[in-house]
UniProtKB/Swiss-Prot annotation:
This is Large ribosomal subunit protein uL29. Belongs to the universal ribosomal protein uL29 family. Pfam families: Ribosomal_L29. The gene is rpmC. GO terms for cellular component: cytosolic large ribosomal subunit.
Amino acid sequence: MKAQDLREKSVEELNAELMNLLREQFNLRMQAATGQLQQTHTLKAVRRDIARVKTVLTEKAGA
């Protein structure tokens, strides 16, 4: 997910994307805790995607 793509979305779409990412992060954390997660790099990728969405939301709030 690129920040450029996120900047083209509306605030409502960004909030929906953020909620989906937070749900996905929760599920991945639970899988990691129970030892079921094979691709541990996805945790880092989702965390950074969440940060990107939050950054764009903050930019839009200030503009």
